[in-house]
């Protein structure tokens, strides 16, 4: 018979404690943070470029949609460009205050037509007030095309995806009318106060005047010298639709363009020599164009002299000048194409057209 005795001084349970792993030192944490910051610094410009490229694609799509609709309009209206057609004594509106009598200025009939479109197409403003004075062929000719497209106003395709202010106004017209956006919207003061109320229905894309100015030399629309949005007209200036077969070089003549370069790190007025943007040509092509590659343009009432000089004097809601000055002076470029519809914007300028 065997006897078993527990061994003395031998622990019955042996506990193995894991060795504590060393922690990060402060220096190591700082190194990791620096590496992350460097990676973010490298990635952010690339991500910004990707976002800008995506928005450029949307912008070009907007212009193509406008081109398709303009082409359909021309087919339905015997080759004419879209343009206001009401005249004093012939303003077929259901709104009594928009019936303009014969003998009134032609511009008042255009203002009535534009107001009629807004009242019927905008759920937000069925009682939109008739602005006066207002000449909607300048900056608002697109409303005729949107009316043809039977879309509610305002419509997203009229705003460049980088035109944040216009998108802001479109999204909350009541706040715009209340002045809630501060310096991000126009001030309702001065002669143009009532016309500024139409800004939510404006477009990032402008139509060159040759498309709607049917006047002979000496009575044509001209650029005022003190800012980029003011024009000079007289009693003999005639507005009307152009025949598209008047366009001699459709692949080289701009039909629609943004007033600013928006798809870059810095926004610039479109005539700035460093500006670049997608433009719609009369052949319906949409091409990224550099301003420096375009002709200088002309003075439509003095075709033999140099180009129209445009004074970019930004409103409070617009991009500042590139120099920080109150204004910058530039040749008018493809806003004032030499030769008008017979001219060339990108290539040798036509010199014999009047």
Segment roles from a protein language model:
Residues 60, 65-354:
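Short, well-structured segments within or immediately adjacent to enzyme catalytic domains
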Residues 21-61:
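Amphipathic alpha-helical segments typified by the pilin-like N-terminal helix
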Residues 4, 13-15, 47-51, 60, ...:
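General helical secondary-structure elements
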């Amino acid at each position: 018979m065997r006897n078993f005795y527990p061994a003395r001084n031998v622990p019955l349970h042996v506990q193995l404690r894991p060795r504590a792993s060393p922690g990060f030192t402060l220096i190591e944490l700082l190194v990791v943070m620096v590496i992350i910051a460097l990676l973010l610094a490298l990635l952010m410009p690339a991500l910004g470029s990707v976002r800008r490229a995506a928005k450029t694609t949307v912008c070009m799509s907007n212009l193509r949609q406008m081109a398709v609709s303009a082409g359909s309009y021309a087919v339905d209206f015997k080759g004419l460009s879209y343009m206001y057609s009401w005249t004093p004594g012939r303003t077929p509106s259901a709104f009594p205050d928009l019936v303009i009598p014969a003998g009134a200025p032609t511009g008042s009939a255009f203002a009535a037509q534009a107001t009629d479109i807004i009242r019927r197409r905008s759920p937000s403003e069925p009682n939109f007030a008739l602005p006066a004075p207002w000449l909607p062929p300048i900056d608002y000719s697109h409303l005729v095309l949107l009316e043809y497209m039977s879309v509610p106003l305002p419509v997203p395709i009229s705003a460049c995806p980088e035109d944040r202010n216009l998108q802001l106004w479109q999204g909350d017209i009541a706040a715009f009318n209340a002045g809630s956006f501060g310096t991000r919207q126009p001030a309702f003061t001065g002669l143009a106060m009532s016309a500024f109320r139409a800004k939510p229905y404006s477009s990032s894309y402008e139509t060159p005047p040759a498309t709607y100015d049917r006047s002979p030399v000496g009575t044509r629309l001209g650029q005022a010298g003190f800012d980029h949005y003011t024009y000079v007209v007289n009693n003999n200036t005639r507005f009307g639709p152009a025949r598209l077969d008047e366009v001699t070089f459709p692949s080289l003549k701009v039909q629609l363009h943004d007033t600013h370069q928006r798809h870059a790190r810095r926004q610039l007025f479109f005539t700035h020599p460093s500006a670049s943007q997608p433009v719609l040509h009369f052949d319906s092509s949409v091409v990224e164009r550099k301003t420096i590659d375009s002709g200088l343009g002309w003075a439509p009432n003095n075709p033999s002299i140099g180009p129209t000089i445009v004074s970019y004097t930004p409103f409070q809601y617009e991009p500042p000048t590139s120099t920080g000055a109150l204004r910058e002076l530039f040749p008018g470029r493809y806003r004032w194409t030499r030769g008008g519809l017979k001219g060339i914007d990108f290539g040798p300028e036509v010199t014999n057209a009047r």
